[in-house]
Design a protein with these regions (language model features):
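Carbohydrate-active catalytic/glycan-binding domains of CAZyme proteins
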Residues: 1-345
């Protein structure tokens, strides 16, 4: 970890760059420095972003160091190469919040302390197809999530999880005591979007590039989201992809798609995407013999397959695409307005 002074007037870094922590066996990243009670606290994520992820805390009287790492008996370690983490799911594969680490903290007006941290909830299935890249690892279809933990300061001036009347530990809780402040509930996210607003709702996201008029439009045809084609799904550059994050292991998603492809290289549809290498894509394209068709493209660790063949769909007619997720199972459907949807795949 390196430290350099920032000049807010000139909006630039100034002065020397100093190495304030050199890890011999543990990787640290995402550092924050805050001052409390005459101490500078160095708050850093440790051990990558996988199932050994955690959070460490160090302190120094001088911002330039040297920094002392907090070490305590409750920090369960199975080797000398492991980090001293004040928060981690490491060695606790049975708890709900896995991959816990990378915290930031806040003090409430009432003097309470809370930490927000990254985590992930594992699915029930392992990764049989990931034996080479990720042996023994689990699937995390919801991606990285954020959790909140209540914290407290020890008599010696170290920040730890507030475990209440329970023994001090460093594993995350799924329920914590809320702050003594007024509630500010977040508005409920609508289940349906008819695209009648001039801008997309905040829950929509694009992949790598901002959403702009170069590939989407909400006013070209009111009540519809128009998307203009770009690179294919395997591209790591610009794509026309608008998505919402999974927030549950069981849900349904559907859309009405109007699309008239002219070539087999043109496609559009409904995708359930983990990353560029892993997804299931129900899409419409064009076959030279069968015409306008629908199929499923499956990508698993950049291994591509079509679980079903091409099925003809009606020309010049909107098609309804739907996916139903129940834990590890995804069932696709397709059909037309006023008709019962047909399963596919």
């Amino acid at each position: 970890l390196v430290l350099q002074e920032y000049d807010p007037v000139k909006n630039t870094m100034v002065g020397p760059v100093k190495d304030i922590y050199q890890a011999d066996t543990v990787f640290l990243e995402g550092p924050h420095i805050f001052k409390r009670g005459g101490w500078y606290y160095l708050f850093s994520a440790d051990t990558g972003t996988g199932e050994s992820h955690g959070q460490t805390i160090q302190r120094s009287r001088n911002i330039w160091g040297p920094y002392e790492m907090y070490k305590a008996d409750f920090m369960h370690r199975e080797s000398e190469k492991e980090a001293y983490s004040i928060l981690t799911s490491r060695h606790h594969r049975d708890i709900l919040l896995q991959k816990s680490g990378h915290c930031d903290i806040v003090e409430t007006p009432q003097g309470e302390w809370y930490a927000v941290h990254l985590c992930a909830r594992a699915g029930r299935e392992r990764n049989p197809a990931d034996a080479v890249r990720f042996p023994g690892k689990r699937r995390y279809p919801l991606g990285r999530e954020t959790a909140v933990q209540k914290m407290r300061w020890t008599r010696e001036g170290w920040l730890v999880l507030d475990c209440g009347c329970r023994p001090q530990g460093n594993t995350p809780f799924t329920e914590v005591e809320g702050p003594d402040t007024e509630e500010h509930p977040y508005p409920a996210i609508p289940d349906r979007d008819d695209f009648i607003n001039p801008v997309l709702a905040l829950e929509y996201q694009s992949l790598r590039i901002p959403m702009d008029r170069h590939f989407i439009s909400l006013d070209a045809r009111p009540g519809w989201l128009r998307m203009y084609g770009r690179s294919g799904l395997s591209s790591r550059f610009s794509q026309s992809l608008i998505a919402r994050r999974w927030t549950s292991f069981s849900f349904e998603a559907s859309t009405k798609l109007e699309f008239e492809p002219e070539l087999f290289k043109q496609m559009a549809g409904l995708i359930f995407l983990y990353d560029t290498d892993n997804y299931l894509y129900l899409h419409i394209s064009r076959d030279e013999d069968a015409g306008k068709c629908i199929s499923i493209l499956r990508a698993e660790n950049r291994s591509y397959s079509y679980p079903v063949g091409w099925l003809p769909v009606r020309e010049h007619c909107p098609v309804i695409l739907k996916g139903v997720v129940r834990q590890e199972m995804l069932q696709f459907y397709y059909g037309y307005d006023g008709e019962e949807l047909r399963p596919i795949g």
